[in-house]
Amino acid sequence: MPMTIADLRTITGRTYPARRRTQNLVGGLSPIQASNFSMGFVTLEPHGGQVPWHNQEQEEVYFILEGKGEMCLGAERSTIVGGQAVFIPPRVFHQLTNTGATPMKMIYCYGPAGDVAHWRQELEGTLPRAGTDAPTLPEGAQPQWTEPPQS
């Protein structure tokens, strides 16, 4: 099997309404495909770019490369900064918000591989809303992005 290389500089990725861009490094439209995990690079815009409150069947890790943000996981809320990683168990609601003045950059890895519903839900404006269709966010957390996509 020949070596396959994914070059972040050539992967366009997708921009989401919650002010982030996701570039698949393994899975999705990446030249690298795996059956046991997916991995990608995410840039959250300053002052509120977000991976909104959601859950998924896969276990996942976020590794923060640069920036500062708020990580919510179940009933917990914490500040997270570059150089830190957080484990996200399957089916646990979670949210990451950039609270800094510069872009936050992170890598996610989850398994098994496959698309996750929250990507489509966010693009369609159908994400379950915290406290209504989903558990409430931890006390004091940044609000969940629920604005519909701009047409």
Question: Language-model segments: which ranges?
Answer:
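Short, surface-exposed secondary-structure boundary micro-motifs
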Residues: 91-92, 111
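Short, conserved beta-strand element in jelly-roll/cupin
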Residues: 36, 41-46, 55-71, 109-111
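Short acidic-glycine-tyrosine-enriched beta hairpin
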Residues: 75-90
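Short acidic/proline- and small/hydrophobic-mixed sequence motifs that coincide with surface turns
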Residues: 34, 103-104
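Structural motif
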Residues: 48, 61, 68-70, 77, ...
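A short, N-terminal "cap"/entry segment at the start of jelly-roll beta-barrel domains
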Residues: 1-37, 51-52, 118-151
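A short beta-to-alpha transition loop/helix N-cap that caps and shapes the active-site region
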Residues: 104, 114-120
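Short beta-strand His + acidic residue motifs that chelate non-heme Fe in jelly-roll/DSBH
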Residues: 51-53, 71-72, 88, 94-100, ...
